[in-house]
């Protein structure tokens, strides 16, 4: 009987705790608050490592949301030309740079839905680097074409408040919002 109680107690502890560890959570501080992001290391290990390495180095702090399309997505992560704290900052070139370390695609079965974080890339499927986007809504036409590496678990209203770009300019943003700070919990 005590073995059954022990099993029940352990089961309760496992299921009542968070389903992710703190190491799997990235905090994204924006002007309107903090966004918590759960990473999918099991689905996109190389991409999660690249992102977390850049976060740990502070590479994303000050990086602008250079392309934001209402109802679709907010794109950021150009650590080369999009970092407003850097001497290389150039809003006209934001979206064309990265860290210089392209990653092989890790397309997976995670859907592009509201709150999904996925890697931006060029035409080459293996050209993802540091840029990523957050989906404002469901975007199934991206499934299997971009690497999903995380999802917003708290603070989606903060993401919704990111300054939107001009639709005529494909979402390019004048005087864009930026990442104030990113850190791993």
Where are these regions (language model features)?
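N-terminal secretory signal peptides that target proteins for export/translocation
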Residues: 1-2
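Bacterial N-terminal signal peptides
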Residues: 5-15
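Cyclophilin-like peptidyl-prolyl cis-trans isomerases
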Residues: 18-185
